[in-house]
A protein has these predicted regions:
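Conserved functional hotspots at enzyme active or ligand-binding sites that engage polyanionic ligands
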Residues: 1-108
Length: 108
């Protein structure tokens, strides 16, 4: 769990423990992008994340980008709310211009 560090911010990427899961939910500890707004992240013990993978089917709801020098897809179809205790370690940030419009289209 990430503790004693700066507040969690939208656009940051963390290693997140997603287990246990059910059915086709994405499993294991993997990178995930924080998509929840900063006011929510500061006020609540939970954040909304979208897992990141280097595999999987290319879909319009899965923006493709490069993260830490590797091709990646943000799985906006697998968004979930997780307790901050599931956040293992901060990995970096992803510019919102690479994913935010797709998120708005999905939710709009």
């Amino acid at each position: 769990m990430v503790s004693g560090l700066a507040p969690v911010k939208r656009g940051e990427v963390y290693w997140v423990n997603l287990d246990p899961t059910i059915g086709t939910e994405i499993k294991k500890t993997r990178p995930a992008l924080v998509v929840s707004p900063d006011d929510m992240n500061a006020a609540l013990p939970r954040v909304i994340v979208a897992p990141i993978t280097s595999k999987g089917q290319a879909l319009g709801c899965r923006p493709e980008l490069v993260f830490n020098g590797q091709p990646a897809r943000v799985l906006l179809d697998q968004i979930r709310c997780v307790d901050k205790a599931r956040l293992v370690k901060k990995m970096g940030d992803i510019d919102p211009t690479l994913w935010h419009d797709t998120l708005l289209q999905m939710l709009g």
